């Protein structure tokens, strides 16, 4: 640097002075406190665009319209944590926890910690205590359900701008909760979109204000896509013919290696969530591990006519399915593929 010789302190001295300052704690850029791991969704399309899932010690926001798959996706993160022997916490502000459905989604509800707070303040304490105790993941369901205690202090509860209170409370909660992520847990908030009024063009917003987006390290937007119908009932408007819907997921923000602004489609069925075999087959097609020509599908030395045929084959041959899963994960996480699988 110019004129460095004329300065009283050398670069090394300045470096050591800053690191040893007891008033403000500083570390080197390679300190282990910055290291993190990820919690996989174990839904290959989502793991692909996030490069392995959501980061621990960070804040993730899942938002979108009603019945668009947000809570189901969050439940799969909890399922992954439980399978790894960790602790998952669900803060049920909407009072919508359904043990039967969560069990059907793969959760061990006997090992789930569930809070039912009535106010934002109670929710804050539940989340803070969970993170400080070392919980692996804490789900807030949802931001739209946050009710500041001040709402209850007014007899009428009307005319006191509760929306502004909610936004202020949520942003203050995040200011105080983000530092608690140093304990190693992942904080995940679910939020819902709302239509704005008074604009020429309808625009979406969400409870809690725009400030919450700046706190996020990972932000995903969910919408409900096309209906999945029974075989031969394509295009039917009869509800009895609908088996599920497509979850459209877009990664809007990711500070840890995700494919930002990428959108994926996940087929979701009412009776059992996601058919993982079919899902991996579809992702393997995208990765070039399985080849399709017209109605024919080719994998290694085998060929199949139609999607149902190849999916059924993998369901009946667990060894081949495990190899497909390993090859697919390797491809979308590292960009490498096994040549023998193509």
Predicted regions: what they are:
Residues 295-342:
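Terminal-proximal interaction/regulatory segments of ATP-powered molecular machines
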Residues 151, 195-199, 293-298, 307-309:
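N-terminal cationic and glycine-rich segments that engage phosphates or anionic surfaces
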Residues 163-287:
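Phosphate-binding/switch region of NTP-binding enzymes
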Residues 5-112, 128-129:
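The Walker A/P-loop phosphate-binding site
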Residues 3-4, 65, 76, 84-172, ...:
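Conserved inter-motif catalytic segment of the P-loop NTP-binding fold
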Residues 46, 102, 141, 191, ...:
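Residue-level signature of catalytic and energy-coupling elements of molecular machines
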Residues 276-305:
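Long, well-ordered amphipathic alpha-helical subdomains in the mid-to-C-terminal portions
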Residues 2-6, 45, 60-62, 83, ...:
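Catalytic phosphate/metal-binding cores of nucleic-acid and nucleotide-processing enzymes, i.e., regions
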